[in-house]
């Protein structure tokens, strides 16, 4: 289960989009159903009734907070336990054999988080910027036709900004790049200064050009979160690349405005629109990021290369072990 993204915590959807009507989502190749009962408890279940395999997302949430299958009316609690089978007299022991698979959930930063596994649930490590009240965050998400690793790869790449974002916030860096082309013969051109500090759950990458007074700090938190610290920006953006399947991902932007920012007057849409440049680029690439032994690399690629090494040593390794374990059993 979750072979392409096993045993990780990840946000799935904003809680504002999950109510008492069941919501069908795909996460890392698995079909899930999300819902919230009248007591405010969120749940994530496998979207398949154990009786006849009907999608539970086509059912309804009952008054007592259970999810009812649309086929025969079987009911399931938020923990997946079967609570009712109509027209049958079953004792608790019999009902316990009819549970649907459920997954651990948390509500953090206005999002529903799911652990992509059912055993050995790890602690959820988060940057302090994601521990504010739920209503502090502005959330936007889109489905992109790309592997999730491509979004992390480009988010860690400082030097894509002057080219991919030349018509938006990368214009200044693009001007510098063009001046470099003119001055290259005189050996007077900007040099990227990139330093990497390993952290408990990823890395911090400090980026700047030697001709500019300021730069960008990028924090990567395993597995799929990148936080950008831009000098002078009145907000803190968190990017999540959430795998849907091998061909699609949900790109979620979670914005924490600085105290004092007027949320009604700040143009968040313009900020979100800048990611469309990234979307166009990574949707033109095929599959997951290649291993570090493939392709050509230069010193400024090191942040992306570190992510790729981690991905192949950790996520891909788990994926292979999960597949092998399934085939053996």
Q: Whereabouts are the PLM-identified features?
A:
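A boundary/linker detector
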Residues: 1-6
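Rieske [2Fe-2S] iron-sulfur-binding domain
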Residues: 11-136, 329
